[in-house]
């Protein structure tokens, strides 16, 4: 399941805004069909484009899910890394993690076969991706995710969170680094 403001890439506008009752009607239909849980996809890229409407939309999802007793797994997703790399299809990580770095030229493909994406993911797992202020990407991701958890954790429908769906792995040694990243994220979220 997706929303509008929680799926909007920084680099483009997609479709039209969903009807005001979209989440209420959807969760009612899901509940009446006998299903009791869904996965709701969201993108950090989308939060940076419009933080207010992003968070309002998440709140609407949680309220509708509570109303119809449907549990939600909130999925922090990425597709082709970011709209920075793939303006036509990509979304996921915000542009400030790529800007001002000649190793990550805009529009050069975010899928696993593209050299800039491979370089970025390798740097990410090495914890060397930073914003223009020098703050590392892991810390920035944790700060973003804490906002998600703060908004959703008190809802009875919140089943859990997927920290990062579909990460790219380009060498066997990156698995250990991904483990360190996941441990870092969980430890940060447990501070709430």
What are the residue ranges of the model-derived segments?
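Active-site mouth of glycoside hydrolases
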Residues: 1-192
């Amino acid at each position: 399941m997706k929303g509008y403001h929680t799926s909007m890439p920084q680099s483009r506008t997609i479709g039209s805004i969903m009807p005001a009752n979209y989440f209420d009607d959807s969760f009612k239909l899901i509940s009446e069909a006998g299903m009791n849980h869904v996965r709701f996809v969201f993108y950090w890229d989308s939060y940076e484009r419009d933080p207010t409407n992003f968070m309002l939309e998440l709140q609407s999802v949680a309220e509708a899910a509570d109303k119809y007793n449907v549990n939600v797994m909130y999925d922090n997703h990425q597709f082709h890394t970011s709209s920075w790399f793939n303006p036509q299809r990509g979304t996921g990580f915000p542009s400030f993690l790529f800007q001002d770095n000649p190793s990550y030229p805009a529009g050069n493909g975010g899928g696993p076969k593209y050299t800039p994406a491979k370089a970025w993911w390798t740097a990410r797992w090495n914890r060397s991706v930073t914003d223009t202020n020098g703050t590392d990407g892991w810390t920035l991701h944790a700060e973003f995710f804490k906002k998600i958890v703060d908004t959703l954790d008190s809802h009875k429908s919140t089943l859990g969170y997927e920290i990062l769906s579909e990460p790219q792995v380009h060498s066997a040694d990156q698995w250990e680094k991904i483990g360190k990243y996941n441990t870092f994220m969980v430890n940060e979220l447990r501070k709430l």
